[in-house]
Regions:
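Acidic (Asp/Glu) and glycine-rich low-complexity loops/linkers
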Residues: 19-143, 149-162, 166-181, 185-200, ...
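Sec-dependent N-terminal signal peptides of Gram-positive bacterial secreted proteins and lipoproteins
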Residues: 2-27
């Protein structure tokens, strides 16, 4: 019994020392570094690994970049050829990765002006938020894991791509809008686009509300699509393997909707010539013979479309 008690005590001591070591390794030193920018710039480029990124208006007319970061993973901030660049500098050794950090890096960019040229962000993990106070010529965001909230407009293209995360684009105008996510939800609300809107979601739902554009294309494997008050001048094209497609007072000159497993229901604003097919399900569409084409195909699901009276 005494030998068994000593063994238990020894195991407890070893476990406690291991836990303390793990905790010590987990608690990385964090610090706030503020970079004041005096040079003039037009473009913004950020390349980082793991960090939340936010753009907010400067309250004193000065540009600065505040980096709350690990001591061994810092960021260089400088202006090069008219571009404000923020790049990660990783000085960690392999043993510095032992453990789990309980804090997270954050980059806050305080901008004095309202309009800039290009914004390019490349990140691995973290959330990104761009305030509605800014306007760019173009926006290009590439992210592995994290949410993106874009409230800033662009005169040309807005491109947002993520592997895993939710993407929000709200109250903006753009020349074109291209959103791609492998796993996550896409929400597009109150958006005016002179050109095309493309939404690609492999697994996840897509919600579009109060949107106008030239052409709308939505593709994906699994997930519902909701179009509410979405108006395309030329074409709406929706393709899904599994998921329902809902149209609420939405319209285009021509519509093409395909889903393998799911219902297609809702209302349009103008008459269409309906071309429909379902292997298992019922079809209920107007018998109109004027208007553009509305082709709807589903293998397993109902097709129910009406023309709004309003």
């Amino acid at each position: 019994m005494r030998r068994f008690a000593l063994l238990r005590l020894l195991l407890f001591i070893i476990f406690s020392m291991g836990l303390l070591t793990l905790t010590a390794c987990s608690l990385s030193d964090y610090e706030t570094n503020i970079h004041k920018i005096n040079e003039e710039f037009y473009n913004i480029s950020i390349k980082t690994d793991t960090a939340d990124i936010a753009f907010v208006p400067s309250n004193d007319g000065m540009c600065r970049v505040a980096c709350y970061e690990e001591a061994k993973i810092s960021h260089s901030v400088e202006v090069q050829n008219g571009t404000l660049t923020v790049n990660v500098v990783n000085n960690k050794k392999w043993y510095d990765y032992i453990g789990v950090n309980i804090d997270s890096t954050k980059i806050t960019v305080y901008l004095p002006e309202v309009e800039y040229s290009s914004l390019v962000i490349e990140a691995s993990t973290g959330d990104i938020e761009i305030s509605k106070d800014f306007k760019f010529k173009s926006i290009d965001i590439s992210l592995s894991t994290g949410d993106v909230k874009c409230y800033a407009s662009a005169t040309e293209a807005i491109k947002i791509a993520a592997s895993t995360g939710d993407i929000f684009a709200e109250s903006i105008s753009a020349g074109s809008l291209d959103i791609t996510v492998s796993t996550g939800k896409v929400t597009v609300s109150s958006v005016t686009c002179e050109g095309d809107i493309t939404v690609g979601v492999s697994t996840g739902k897509a919600y579009l509300t109060d949107v106008t554009c030239k052409n709308l294309t939505s593709t994906g494997s699994t997930g519902d699509v909701s179009l509410r008050n979405v108006i395309s001048k030329e074409k709406i094209s929706v393709e899904r393997s599994t998921g329902d497609v809902t149209l609420d007072r939405s319209d285009a000159a021509d519509l093409f909707i395909t889903t393998s497993t799911g219902d297609v229901e809702g209302s349009l604003l103008t008459d269409k010539v309906f071309i429909t097919k379902t292997d298992t399900g019922c079809i209920n569409v107007p018998n109109s013979i004027t208007g553009g084409r509305c082709e709807i195909t589903t293998e397993t699901g109902d097709i129910k479309i009406s023309i709004s009276d309003d």
